[in-house]
């Protein structure tokens, strides 16, 4: 529906051979499963923005709900979706479009209710006050920068997306081509960095979390950036 066959083949092929993602596909962890639900939730929202078919909005919201059910950090994708869909809904005065995305938070709310009713408590690791730690910021920046440019982990995923953005920047500015999808990707990335910053690392070092957990979390962005790459106007029209 969105991209021609050649673009679909190219994006699917390079996504499937993403080195580190391919390696983790053989394990029983939740990383790749989470990547599937999170990325498809974002992608179907991008499809909904193009065609405005309600089924795409509902499917996107369901996938985002599964995403946060799989891993708590998935809230960053719901947060990004709420920002973009919320802005679009208020601009068009179609407020009901925001409801399905809001409902995607229900698994987290139900889990919190279940824990409270059963007297289950987890030690809080979030720092809920505002603070500044320059060393922590520098550590997060350096590790995340190195992850995004690491072709051994993610193949050409982020490099191709950046190139696609640069050659299509005129359409992005003038006609907002793929701007909503780009906004969701960037906002989710920003929210994840904020979470990394606001965590009190009692059980492990921040370096280990960035080197291993964050590395696997970025799997979620691989399908999103390939979809962005092959659906840009200048790429589709040659």
Q: What spans do the regions from the language model cover?
A:
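Transmembrane alpha-helical segments of multipass membrane enzymes and assembly factors
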Residues: 1-8, 47-50, 232-235
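Membrane-interfacial loop-to-transmembrane alpha-helix junctions, especially the N-terminal start
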Residues: 7-11, 56, 96-101, 175-186
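Hydrophobic cores of alpha-helical transmembrane segments in multi-pass inner/ER membrane proteins
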Residues: 40, 81, 157-166, 221-231
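Transmembrane-helix signature of polytopic, lipid-linked glycan biosynthesis machinery
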Residues: 19-26, 66-68, 111-116, 186-212
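Membrane-interface alpha helices of multi-pass inner-membrane proteins
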Residues: 11-16, 57-72, 80-82, 105-106, ...
């Amino acid at each position: 529906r969105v991209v021609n066959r050649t673009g679909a083949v190219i994006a699917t092929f390079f996504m499937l051979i993403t080195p580190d993602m391919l390696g983790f596909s053989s394990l029983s962890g939740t990383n790749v499963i989470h990547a599937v639900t999170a990325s498809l939730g974002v992608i179907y929202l991008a499809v909904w923005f193009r065609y405005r078919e309600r089924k795409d909005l509902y499917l996107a919201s369901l996938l985002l709900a599964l995403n946060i059910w799989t891993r708590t950090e998935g809230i960053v994708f719901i947060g990004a979706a709420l920002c973009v869909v919320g802005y679009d809904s208020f601009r068009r005065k179609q407020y009901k479009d925001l409801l399905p995305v809001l409902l995607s938070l229900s698994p987290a709310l139900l889990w919190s209710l279940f824990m409270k009713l059963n007297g289950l408590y987890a030690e809080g690791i979030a720092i809920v006050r505002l603070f500044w730690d320059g060393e922590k910021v520098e550590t997060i920046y350096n590790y995340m920068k190195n992850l995004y440019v690491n072709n051994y982990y993610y193949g050409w995923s982020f490099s191709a997306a950046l190139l696609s953005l640069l050659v299509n920047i005129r359409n992005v500015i003038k006609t907002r081509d793929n701007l909503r999808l780009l906004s969701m990707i960037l906002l989710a990335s920003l929210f994840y960095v904020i979470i990394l910053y606001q965590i009190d690392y009692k059980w492990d070092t921040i370096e280990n979390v960035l080197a291993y957990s964050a590395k696997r979390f970025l799997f979620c962005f691989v399908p999103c950036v390939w979809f962005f790459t092959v659906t840009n106007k200048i790429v589709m029209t040659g």
